[in-house]
């Protein structure tokens, strides 16, 4: 399939996620404020189950899911696991378009990858492409050591929880990190083209 074909095929399966979290402010006046966050998710059943990253929804009071056609739903967290950074959400909807689940164990370095997500929390259904740059890459994400797929598809904040698809349009990974590591002197090394995804076999 062409990248255009894959994009048309998979975009209805990817959702934008917006979260609201009450954050206490430790001031003399007490009080709290609402901190909003954004991420992405992938529909895995036609009746509203959605997989995303645990760090996207962790601590959220309100979670809103927006489908590719703009319809919005309130989502509930069915389960989440911070170690694998996977969470499952549920929305009350039917007739959705679930992603076709691929096999991340059969991936080869150099294969085409297509990432679909909501970068910066405002650019929903953005499609970027690249290749599988490495497999079983040991990466530490928020204190957890993980074995991830490395891809050159452009990944930005807000892409987390979105889908990484292969050239057949099958879901092979859940995007969860990009390189933002610091050197031992504390300088940020924002390398481009270093994105990471949880292998779908691990996530499932």
Regions found by a protein language model. Give the residues of each.
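Serine-dependent protease modules
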Residues: 1-204
């Amino acid at each position: 399939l062409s990248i255009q074909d894959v994009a048309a095929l998979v975009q209805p399966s990817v959702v934008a996620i917006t979260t609201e979290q009450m954050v206490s402010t430790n001031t003399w006046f007490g009080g709290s404020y609402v901190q909003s966050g954004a991420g992405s998710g992938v529909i895995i059943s036609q009746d509203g189950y959605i997989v995303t990253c645990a760090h996207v929804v962790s601590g959220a009071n309100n979670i809103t899911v927006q489908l590719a056609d703009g319809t919005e739903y309130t989502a509930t967290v069915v389960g989440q696991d911070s170690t694998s950074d996977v969470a499952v959400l549920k929305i009350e909807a039917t007739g959705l378009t679930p992603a076709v689940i691929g096999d991340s164990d059969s991936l080869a370095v150099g294969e085409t990858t297509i990432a679909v997500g909501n970068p910066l929390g405002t650019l929903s259904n953005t499609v970027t492409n690249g290749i599988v740059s490495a497999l079983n890459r040991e990466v530490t994400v928020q204190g957890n050591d993980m074995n991830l797929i490395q891809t050159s598809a452009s990944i930005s904040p807000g892409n987390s929880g979105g889908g990484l698809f292969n050239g057949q349009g099958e879901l092979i990974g859940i995007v969860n990190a990009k390189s933002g590591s610091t050197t031992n002197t504390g300088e940020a090394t924002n390398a481009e083209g270093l994105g990471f995804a949880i292998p779908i076999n691990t996530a499932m």
